[in-house]
Swiss-Prot record:
Reactions that this protein is recorded to catalyse: Hydrolysis of proteins in presence of ATP
CDD domains: RecA-like_Lon (cd19500)
First and last residues of the transit peptide: 1-37
Domain of life: Eukaryota
GO biological process: cellular response to oxidative stress; chaperone-mediated protein complex assembly; mitochondrial DNA metabolic process; mitochondrial protein quality control; mitochondrial respiratory chain complex assembly; mitochondrion organization; oxidation-dependent protein catabolic process; protein folding
Record's compositionally biased regions (Acidic residues): 348-358
Protein encoded by which gene: PIM1
Organism: Saccharomyces cerevisiae (strain ATCC 204508 / S288c)
Name by which UniProt lists this protein: Lon protease homolog, mitochondrial
Listed Basic and acidic residues bias regions: 98-117, 125-143, 282-301, 325-340, 853-889
Length: 1133
């Protein structure tokens, strides 16, 4: 560290510092060697200089002697006078120097000048005198800059991409040959070439502020260097390797604020005019730590404080009393090189002659103010073109070839024609021969060409004129090829569409240009969309191959072709299938049981089967697909239980119905060549659920169509529901195998009779029986009533339905096996209850008229109601709904209104009873027996009636007639029962010849309802025997079972439904085949409760139960009187 002790007053030091800086400014203005001038200027030289003697100073005269151009003499004299006047003003006590002088009285006369090792000449910031000097010396240049700004702006807009900037406006002049440390600005995508304007957009706030001050100081020179990474967006250079080392010295001719349309941030648009090639010598990147420590360094930044106080004298009164130290001022004002030289002068007077040869270690930098903005700065070296022979045949030939190419391009491209004309005009104004400016011609060729970044930068870096011309000719040839190709495309399109309309011509031309140039027409975006979809999918190898093939086809087809749309739709479906995606299985049995119990009452078999399914999956660690079929009457919850199962298993749910389906394409899809072709329902389910293991509910599978011109859908379901085949299900549209082995299929049906046998074999059937009265009461109380109250808006109101009302509703109105009809009636009851509640509330709230009421109050209330009505009508529909909801909430909190629906007032809500009695017959006559039948609606009672068509008579052939819309099976059963009854009666009571003399008519009530089934044999036989024995059957006995000709009782189905129907009909004894005894034991206790079972193996077991009090004598003598009359008549005849 250099330390120098001097003894001088503060005014002398300030004068010395000011003089040194003044001469530096003159050296910069004169564009001479700053190093040499600074080496001749020392503290001793200017220590005794006075303002009036500045020009007569020996150092100044020596400097004048070095200047060769006399035009600077008058200019320097004016600058010297300005400095003198300013220096005189500083001695009046109004400037910072006077304050410093007064402050120095408090300090010692001996001052230590201790510059810090880190401080250099470059840290000196120009003072106000520098600004005066710069403004005076560049006055003429600023005029040229302002005049060229408009011209440059017009030229840059003509071809902003190439940046040629050709303009008729004269370029800025008076550029310093040697420029100090300057701002470095990175340029993206294209380098700048000397002599051609270029507009750049700056977004960095620091750079924008620096450029503004540069323009204010009239030092608008920067170094522009192209970024190596064209995608990088920055306005500062942090690393020398980020840019190319060769750039241009550019002058900012104009700058104006702008705004980024995308981000909305404030930016600056600057118009640059490059002057010459330069090369980075040293880079000073922005110091980020300096920004953070700027506040801390504020107290030590003495130079900044001095300059601000000098420019604003009024602010000195409010300045903090902490005045910067004298050492700091001296350090900032006296560079290291001068202090070193001053030390050497004080040491010896003999070495003063050697000062001319001293090279200063640091550049004198009048642009020191740029460091305040923390931007990237550079020291540069000027690059001069290598000398060349103007008469060189190679250079002349290259020049001629470039001119030839320009001529050819101008004939093909009008934009080039205008640029070439402008360039020719500028050349002619400077010289009459273009061959004298080959370097400028090469730069122009590169500036207007759309070449690659590396190629253009290579041209800029070439200092050999011959090489530069060769490279420029190469990029210009490429430009010619592009122009020729564009012209060829234009001609080809014109040939194709000569006879077509103008609109079609333009469209075809656009297509041709896009096809030749490879411009995206939407297909690339579509292809990218499909490729992006499959990134998250796990496509099988076979599917991946098909996808790649279809993508290749799509990329080669025109968008207007019909096949393009077919392939696009196909790829859309192919990429919409969730290949490899599975929802996470839920193996918690308590959670699944809780969900199933919340949604449905009873259904123990279904719930146990689902819990078994979960248990097996938990043990195996995986769950394979199953096919379950729920069979039961309507309204028992087959479809809703499917949703609950999906929720319990944490699977997606999809439902579609096949009832009435006659087209196999609904299952397997259409061929994609057909217009409007779509995949089948199964593929659509996978797309919607976006998992390969959803729960798919196939509803009404028993009502699917069978055969036809469009195929058999039930046969198509075989592949879907077969566990051995559905792992490679083939959809006609996609035509690729799809794995359905993880899908859980749930089918619903009302009957198994109409389901094809092969399809039924592939399903696991679970029968859902109807509900008994006790079950219905629980369902109504726990599910139906709360739901109906909520839908009617009476959820929290005192409107209740008693249990006896629910029981009466089921007994007299809703006798079906399910609860759908019961739900409808309950909802109807609560809607009517809501109406009553609203009416009661209106009556309670309406004002009662009295003699004491005043007319004014009535009028005001009416006006108020009218105003409320008007304001309510102006509100939106949503507001009205909210208001209604608020009124209902107020109704719910009303304790005065209490509505109870009981058995007594039930008919006020649902009308008179539909069923007046529990049974059709309270007392059955002979020949009438209650049978039990199973239908799609569940179990029901089926009465069989047998009567004599006429009194017993002598006939050779007794007659038997049956009615009631019986099916073929029941007709066969009735004929069999008639024969069995004749045989059984003859064996049991041989003297009873009833069937020999009787004409019997058998009928099943409700003749409009078709009846069929093999379970009414015992009922018909009992009806015949009851008529033959003239014995009534107990009306509380119900029976079911098929009968053989010998009296064997055969097994039947639907025992649970029939038992429920018997109990619902008031039966107390139920007779069924002995083979169904196990089914009876599996019935719930609430179903068996109140029923006495009789499991009959032979019909004799039934006869003994029903006719146990009929002995042989009584049975033989039932029709004894009629037989005697008929015998006597026969003997008489």
């Amino acid at each position: 560290m250099l330390r120098t002790r001097t003894t001088k007053t503060l005014s002398t030091v300030a004068r010395t510092t000011r003089a040194i800086q003044y001469y530096r400014s003159i050296a910069k203005t004169a564009a001479v060697s700053q190093r040499r001038f600074a080496s001749t200027l020392t503290v001793r030289d200017v220590e005794n200089i006075k303002p009036s003697h500045i020009i007569k100073s020996p150092t100044w005269q020596e400097f004048q002697h070095q200047l060769k151009d006399p035009r600077y003499m008058e200019h320097f004299a004016q600058l010297d006078a300005q400095f003198a006047r300013h220096f005189m003003a500083t001695n009046s006590g109004k400037s910072i120097l006077a304050k410093d002088d007064s402050t120095s009285q408090k300090k010692d006369e001996d001052v230590k000048i201790v510059p810090d090792e880190k401080d250099t000449d470059n840290d000196v910031e120009p003072t106000r005198d520098d600004e005066i000097v710069n403004k005076d010396q560049e006055g003429e240049a600023s005029k040229n800059s302002r005049s060229s700004a408009s011209g440059g702006g017009q030229s840059s807009s003509s071809r902003s991409d190439s940046g040629d900037g050709s303009s008729k406006q004269k370029p800025p002049k008076d550029v310093p040959e040697v420029y100090p440390q300057m701002l470095a600005l990175p340029i993206a995508r294209r380098p700048l070439f000397p002599g051609f304007y270029k507009a750049v957009v700056i977004s960095d706030e620091r750079v924008m502020k620096a450029i503004k001050e540069m323009l204010d100081r009239q030092q608008p020179y920067i170094g522009a260097f192209m970024l190596k990474n064209s995608e990088e967006d920055t306005d500062v250079i942090t690393d020398k390797n980020d840019v190319y080392d060769v750039g241009v010295l550019a002058q900012i001719t104009s700058a104006f604020p702008s705004k980024d349309e995308k981000t909305g941030t404030e930016t600056m648009t600057a118009l640059l005019y490059p002057h010459r090639r330069i090369k980075i010598d040293e880079l000073f990147p922005p110091n980020e730590e300096k920004e953070k420590s700027k506040e801390q360094a504020k107290d030590t930044d003495t130079e900044t404080t001095v300059v601000e106080d000098a420019n604003n004298p009024e602010d000195q009164e409010s300045t903090s009393p902490a005045t910067p130290k004298l050492e700091d001022i001296v350090v900032e004002r006296i560079p290291d090189s001068e202090l070193q030289h001053h030390k050497r002068v004080e040491a010896t007077e003999e070495e003063s002659e050697e000062l001319d040869d001293i090279q200063e270690g640091e550049d004198i930098n009048p642009t020191e103010f740029l460091k305040n903005y923390n931007v990237s700065l550079v020291n540069v070296l000027n690059l001069e073109d290598e000398p060349f022979d103007r008469k060189s045949p190679v250079i002349n030939a290259l020049t001629s070839e470039i001119l030839k190419v320009f001529k050819e391009i101008s004939q093909l491209n009008t934009m080039f024609r205008e640029q070439i004309a402008t360039f020719s005009a500028s050349i002619q104004s400077a010289t009459t021969n273009i061959f004298e400016e080959p370097a400028r011609l090469a730069d122009f060729a590169a500036a207007v060409s759309a070449g690659e970044e590396d190629e253009l930068q290579d041209i800029l870096s070439s200092l050999n004129i011959e090489h530069r011309l060769e490279k420029s000719l190469l990029v210009l040839k490429k430009e010619l090829m592009n122009a020729e190709l564009q012209n060829k495309i234009s001609k080809d399109v014109e040939t194709k569409i000569q006879k077509r309309q103008r609109e079609y011509y333009l469209m075809e031309q656009l297509k041709g240009i896009k096809r030749e140039l490879g411009i995206d027409d939407g297909r690339d975006k579509l292809i990218d969309t499909y490729k992006e979809r499959i990134k998250s999918l796990k496509l099988p190898d076979s599917v991946q191959k098909i996808f790649d093939d279809e993508i290749t086809k799509l990329s080669t087809l025109e968008t207007s072709m019909s096949e393009f749309g077919v392939i696009r739709n196909y790829l859309d479906w192919l990429t919409s299938i969730p290949w490899g995606k599975h929802s996470k299985e839920q193996y918690s049995i308590p959670r699944a049981k809780k969900i199933l119990d919340e949604d449905h009452y009873g259904m123990v078999d279904v719930k146990d089967r689902i819990l078994e399914f979960i248990a097996v999956g938990k043990l195996l660690g995986k769950v394979d697909g199953k096919i379950i079929c729920f069979v039961g009457p309507p309204g028992v919850g087959k479809t809703s239980i499917g949703k609950s199962i999906a929720r319990a298993l944490n699977r997606k749910f999809f439902r579609f119905s096949v009832g009435g389906m006659t087209d196999v394409a609904e299952i397997k899809g259409h061929r994609r060549t057909y217009i409007g072709a779509l995949p089948g329902r199964v593929v659509q389910a996978l797309k919607k659920c976006q998992t390969q293991n959803p729960l798919i509910l196939i509803d009404e599978i028993d009502k699917i169509g069978h055969g036809g011109i469009h195929g058999d859908p039930s046969a198509a379901l075989l592949e879907v529901l077969d566990p051995e085949q559905n792992n490679s299900f083939l959809d006609n549209y996609l035509d690729i195998p799809i794995d359905l082995s993880k899908v859980l299929f749930v089918c619903t049906a009302n009957s198994l009779e109409t389901i094809p046998r092969p399809l039924l074999d592939r399903m696991e059937v679970i029968e859902l029986t109807g509900y008994v009265a006790e079950d219905k009461v629980k369902i109504a109380e726990q599910y139906l009533v709360p739901s109906a109250k909520k839908s009617a808006g009476l959820e929290n109101s005192h409107v209740d339905m008693t249990e006896d009302a629910i029981t009466a509703l089921m007994k007299y109105y809703c006798r079906e096996s399910g609860v759908r009809n019961l739900k409808k009636h309950i909802e109807k009851i609560y809607r009517k209850a809501a109406l009553q509640v609203v009416k009661k509330l209106s009556i309670e709230d309406s004002p009662t008229s009295s003699a004491d009421s005043k007319p004014k109050e009535s009028v005001s209330s009416e006006e108020k109601a009218e105003n409320n009505a008007k304001s309510s009508s102006e509100k939106t529909k949503d507001n009205n709904s909210e208001k209604t909801s608020d009124d209902i909430e107020a109704l719910k909190t009303s304790e005065k209104i209490n509505v109870s629906i009981s058995q007594k007032n039930l008919k006020d809500y649902v009308g008179p009873p539909v069923y007046t009695t529990d049974r059709l017959y309270e007392t059955t006559p002979p020949g009438v027996v209650m049978g039990l039948a199973w239908t799609n609606m569940g179990g029901c009672s089926l009465y069989v009636e047998s009567v004599l068509e006429q009194p017993l008579h002598n006939c050779k052939h007794p007659t038997f007639e049956r009615t009631g819309q019986l099916g073929d099976v029941m007709k066969e059963s009735s004929r069999l029962a008639y024969s069995f009854a004749k045989m059984y009666l003859a064996q049991k009571f041989p003297e009873n010849r009833f069937f020999e003399k009787a004409s019997i008519h058998l009928h099943c009530p409700e003749g409009a309802t078709p009846k069929d089934g093999p379970s009414a044999g015992v009922t018909m036989a009992t009806s015949f025997l009851s008529l033959a024995l003239n014995k009534s059957i107990d009306p509380t006995v119900a029976m079911t079972g098929e009968l053989t000709l010998t009296g064997k009782v055969l097994r039947i189905g639907g025992l649970r439904e029939k038992a429920v129907a018997a109990k619902r009909s008031g039966a107390k004894t139920i007779i069924f085949p002995k083979d169904n005894l196990n089914d009876w034991e599996e019935l719930p206790d609430n179903v068996k409760e109140g029923l006495e079972p009789l499991a009959a193996d032979w019909y004799n077991d039934i006869f003994q139960k029903l006719f146990k009090d009929v002995n042989t004598k009584e049975g033989n003598s039932v029709w004894k009187a009629e037989f005697e009359i008929l015998d006597a008549k026969k003997e008489k005849d």
